[in-house]
């Protein structure tokens, strides 16, 4: 996939802000202990999670980056945010090549027994290989109450989503203009065995493809709290669409 690197990703910035607002609203007073992410060179997701109090300086970071050339800048960005070498493990590999055993070793190195927050921010499609990876990580590495966030391409390789096209009862997913939002939400609910709450379809200006972001799981199921989070989420629907 070819991201347009000459343009600022203003829509993604709004989506990232809304994502961590939602996680904060549905997990009040909780600071996550171990954050699995794909922060790239700017670590925007780590910065926003820290700003909103979803994580703090005691949180352990497991960062994944497949491009060896980006590692130096990634580590510098994490260090500037307060996550030095003793607070992080950086894994350089393709996402689906990383086994649960490798992630458990990273947890052990950091002094935690599991991962309780994931942001699988990919530029990939939700093909079966990625589905299996998510299933494996949730089953073997994540804590029982973990929050799993996934950001995937919504309109390229869709053959492995065909069986999920039956309409499901997903919060706000019917308001997404991208027709693959509901199947993706359905698929991720099955992969994670967690309710899909936050579902947003968006698209950056330029050549970038449409994306769908989903959050699975939350600690609070109180109707009033969810209603507030849903109202906030509505404001992020269809960003970047005409």
PLM features per residue range, with description:
Residues 163-182:
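Acidic, Ser/Thr-rich peripheral helices and adjacent loops at domain boundaries
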Residues 52-56, 137-143:
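Short, conserved loop/helix-junction motifs that constitute active-site signature segments
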Residues 124-139:
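A short, conserved alpha-helix within the catalytic core of class I
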Residues 142-157:
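Conserved beta-strand signature within the Rossmann-like core of class I S-adenosyl-L-methionine
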């Amino acid at each position: 996939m070819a991201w347009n690197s000459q343009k600022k990703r203003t829509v993604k910035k709004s989506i990232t802000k809304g994502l961590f607002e939602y996680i904060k609203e549905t997990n009040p007073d909780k600071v996550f202990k171990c954050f699995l992410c794909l922060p790239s060179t700017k670590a925007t997701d780590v910065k926003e999670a820290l700003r909103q109090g979803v994580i703090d300086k005691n949180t352990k970071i497991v960062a994944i980056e497949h491009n060896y050339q980006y590692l130096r800048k990634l580590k510098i960005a994490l260090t500037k945010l307060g996550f030095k070498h003793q607070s992080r493990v950086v894994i350089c590999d393709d996402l689906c090549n990383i086994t649960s055993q490798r992630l458990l070793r990273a947890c052990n190195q950091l002094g935690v027994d599991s991962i309780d927050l994931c942001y699988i921010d990919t530029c990939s499609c939700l093909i079966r290989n990625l589905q299996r990876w998510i299933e494996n990580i949730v089953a073997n590495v994540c804590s029982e109450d973990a929050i799993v966030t996934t950001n995937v391409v919504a309109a390229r390789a869709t053959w492995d989503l065909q069986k999920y096209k039956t309409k499901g009862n997903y919060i706000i997913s019917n308001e997404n203009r991208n027709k693959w939002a509901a199947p993706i939400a359905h698929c991720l609910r099955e992969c994670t065995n967690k309710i899909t709450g936050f579902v947003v379809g968006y698209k950056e200006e330029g050549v970038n493809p449409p994306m769908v972001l989903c959050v699975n799981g939350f600690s609070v199921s109180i109707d009033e709290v969810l209603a507030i989070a849903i109202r906030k989420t509505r404001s992020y629907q269809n960003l970047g669409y005409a």
